Amino acid sequence: MALTFPSPEWTAQLKTVVNNDQAYAQSAKTWEGDFYFIIEPGPGIKQPVKMYLDLWHGKCRKAHIAAGVEDKPPEFTISGTLETYRRVFEKKLDPIQALMTRKLKVQGNMMKIVRSVKPTLDLVNCCSMIPTSYPDQVQA
């Protein structure tokens, strides 16, 4: 059954997939950083949705839809439209290219992400493993 992106269920499933993915565990074994992934308002999204991920040494320590502000701001904030995230998850848009062309906007040390291409691609691969539907495909 497909899970709707973005949703608490999809986010919880991503944590499970990341924590069971050997490729991500290996490529991100030295990665330390947390993120807000913000899905901007648009078709199917009435207000911004903030998904929080805490990635640490190849594992996901926390993953949830953030209702407010975290105790401390995350190291990175990446924001984009639902369609951009969909294209990245469906591997129709390279995530690094999306960052460089500002289809996905980054706050934080972009060079740290650019130097971490393999973990970035493996994280996107984890996202791609989740059977996903989108709010513009179903009534939200």
Language model feature labels by segment:
Residues 1-140:
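Feature captures hydrophobic
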